[in-house]
Amino acid sequence: MRVVVSIGGSVLAPDLDPDRVAAYAEAIERLAADGCEVGVVVGGGGVAREYIETARELGANEVELDQLGIGTTRLNARLLIAALAGGANLSPATGYDEAAAALRRGEVSVMGGVTPGQTTDAVAAAFAESVDADLLVYATSANGVYDADPNVDDDATQFGSMSPAELVDIVLPMSRNAGASAPVDLLAAKLIDRAGIRSIVLDGTNPEVVVDAVLRGDHTGTDVIPTGSEEPIYWTGSSDA
């Protein structure tokens, strides 16, 4: 099974804790050992935001801020590559062809941001589409997709499952509200809808949750299920992991 895992920077390295990065590397290694082809996209998290806020105060324009954010995602990606100890590409892929080539070599393919104006949410969706991934997992700091921002609405209700089109409908109004926090960004949702990518949005604070979700479909997040989508092979009983 080919899977792309998007790990938020605030999930992987909220405080540059080496034990946390190592735990994520171990989880990814378990997926690879079980026969998965694994691509990983790493976000910038709080570190990126701090750099961006500082650079904005210094007068940097939006493209410069985006480039700074991309650089931070690649630093986080390098941390993960170091923890994977030779099982991944030597340096973060800077484009989709390079990332796909690493998969073809049998490596864990790790990348950060790619293009100014595009979040790592969207990068992960585009990467998954480009390699025809069976599954896309967003390991975030939120436990799935809600009908409203749970950070500001105590009555927000979580979806157990939804279609990609429904994901777009949920994310669209959040993308227009500067105070709202969408589970994935709008471009990512549209790419998932366009490509019909089976996806999961979950709380990735514990890396073991990602392993359970990929190998067994066992999680408490939200399944994004395209029409006619088949369950990944591991969920149909071909693996006892």
From Swiss-Prot:
Pathway: Pyrimidine metabolism; CTP biosynthesis via de novo pathway; UDP from UMP (UMPK route): step 1/1
Gene Ontology biological process: 'de novo' CTP biosynthetic process; UDP biosynthetic process
UniProt keyword Transferase, yes or no: yes
One Pfam family per UniProt: AA_kinase
Swiss-Prot/TrEMBL catalytic activity: UMP + ATP = UDP + ADP
Binding positions for UMP per the UniProt entry: 44, 66, 114-120
Cleaved signal peptide residues: none
Subcellular location: Cytoplasm
Start and end residues of each stretch annotated as Disordered: 222-241
EC number, UniProt record: 2.7.4.22
GO molecular function, one term: ATP binding
Disulfide bonds: none
Notes on how activity is controlled: Inhibited by UTP.
Residues bound to ATP: 9-10, 45, 49, 140, 146, 149
UniProt entry keywords in alphabetical sequence: ATP-binding, Cytoplasm, Kinase, Nucleotide-binding, Pyrimidine biosynthesis, Transferase
InterPro entries documented for this protein: AceGlu_kinase-like_sf (IPR036393), Asp/Glu/Uridylate_kinase (IPR001048), Uridylate_kinase (IPR011817), Uridylate_kinase_arch/spir (IPR011818)
UniProt cross-references to SUPFAM superfamilies, sorted A to Z: Carbamate kinase-like
Function recorded in the entry: Catalyzes the reversible phosphorylation of UMP to UDP.
Family listed: Belongs to the UMP kinase family.
Record's protein name: Uridylate kinase
Organism of derivation: Halorubrum lacusprofundi (strain ATCC 49239 / DSM 5036 / JCM 8891 / ACAM 34)
Native organism taxonomy: Archaea, Methanobacteriati, Methanobacteriota, Stenosarchaea group, Halobacteria
